[in-house]
């Protein structure tokens, strides 16, 4: 997974192309590009046609992602970029807050998967709020599965908190882990 940002602090455009070529030579390896589809991400998706594109609604000013897609407000715009990516043969995942009622909206705009934004789970682990937060994630994963979506998860995950999340959210297909 790479997250090319307009400020190029994580990866440069040439790196995206080079990494795509490298991974295509390794059968069975997937290439996921994540970022804001309304900035520069779609140019990369068109150029390299990754296995998966994860649409994250971050802004230029953000140091890191801090919220999921607001499909109630921006659903029509996401529907267009999802359709474009899928027409290129790219699986699409939408970065989503753990709100079970919004999982069907991701399916309605054409997404194949959602990625649960797990920062709130990681932040509450070991506190009195942890059980309720874990339940919210489990319900969101269940709702996504019932809507016919694959489920990814990521943000502030580590070996210290991953197992508990995977046990509670049995439908998770893929995780992005920050540290071991």
PLM feature segments, named:
Residues 53-112:
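Hydrophobic, well-structured mid-protein blocks that either form specific transmembrane helices
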Residues 5-10, 40, 61-63, 70-71, ...:
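Short, small-residue-enriched loops and turns at beta-alpha junctions
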Residues 38-49, 98-109, 153, 157-172:
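Catalytic cores of alpha/beta
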Residues 91-144:
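Histidine/lysine/aspartate-rich catalytic loop segments that bind and position anionic ligands
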Residues 9-35, 71-93, 129-153:
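Alpha-helix-loop-beta-strand connector modules within alpha/beta enzyme cores
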Residues 3, 54-62, 113-125, 170-180:
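Glycine-rich phosphate-binding active-site loops on the catalytic face of alpha/beta enzymes
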Residues 1, 28-32, 52-54, 89-95, ...:
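Structural preference for beta-strand elements that scaffold enzyme active sites
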Residues 12-30, 105-115, 164-179:
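Short, electropositive alpha-helical surface patch
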């Amino acid at each position: 997974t790479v997250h090319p940002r307009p400020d190029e602090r994580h990866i440069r455009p040439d790196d995206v192309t080079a990494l795509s070529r490298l991974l295509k030579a390794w059968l069975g390896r997937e290439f996921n590009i994540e970022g804001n589809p309304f900035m520069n991400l779609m140019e990369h998706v068109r150029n390299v046609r990754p296995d998966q594109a994860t649409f994250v609604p971050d802004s230029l000013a953000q140091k890191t992602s801090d919220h999921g897609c607001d499909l109630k407000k921006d659903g029509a715009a996401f529907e267009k970029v999802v359709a474009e990516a899928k027409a290129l043969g790219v699986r699409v995942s939408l970065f989503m807050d753990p709100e079970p009622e919004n999982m069907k909206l991701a399916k309605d705009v054409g997404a194949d998967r959602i990625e649960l934004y797990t920062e709130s789970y990681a932040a509450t682990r070991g506190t009195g709020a942890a059980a309720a937060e874990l339940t919210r994630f489990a319900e969101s994963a269940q709702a996504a599965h019932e809507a016919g979506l694959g489920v990814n998860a990521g943000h502030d995950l580590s070996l210290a908190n991953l197992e508990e999340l995977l046990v509670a959210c049995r439908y998770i297909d893929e995780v992005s882990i920050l540290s071991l």
